[in-house]
Amino acid sequence: VNPGLVADPAPIKEMTYNEMRELSYAGFAVFHDEAILPAIQGKIPICVKNTNRPEMPGTKIVPRDKVSHKNKITGIASSHHFQAIYLHRYLINREVGFTAKILKIMADLNISYEHMPSGIDDLTIILDKNQLTNGRKEKLTQRIKDEIQPDDLQWRNDYAIIMVVGEGLVNRVGAMADIVDPIRDAGISLTMVNQGSSEISI
């Protein structure tokens, strides 16, 4: 957990490459992805230390089969630089190629998406708002209106993502409730919950 947000967080003694990658997605910025690729490919353990406190043991990053224990939760990371575009159109779930048309527009504008939850009549596209500069947001909006013709289109600003990561989440009954309940108790509404197929992150 970011010590700037939580006082005296527990140190992470050990994590897997996969856990590190999941945490880095939501702001756990320690390594550049390409910089550690040779270590991952060679299954070489990495030790991360605090330059201000080099006497501390630091965090070991190891292959999954070398981890000495699997924490229920290894780390929590967050990022707040997201926006979402919400589209509503009757029976979009039956329209072949609907999502592909939107992705083509985004590709033309060199915009990638983070998540795309959908329903029977609606679709939400969550984007890194750092991509929506230099008029791209306006161009994306106009092209979707012209080419997709949604019944409703809305921008929803200031989304945050909280990433909870741990190898111990795999197949653990009640993991989702343990994470969601404190958020509910804090009076925070959830827009979307997503657990990847690897099950190590929520």
Regions found by a protein language model. Name each.
Residues V1-I202:
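C-terminal catalytic "cap/lid" subdomain
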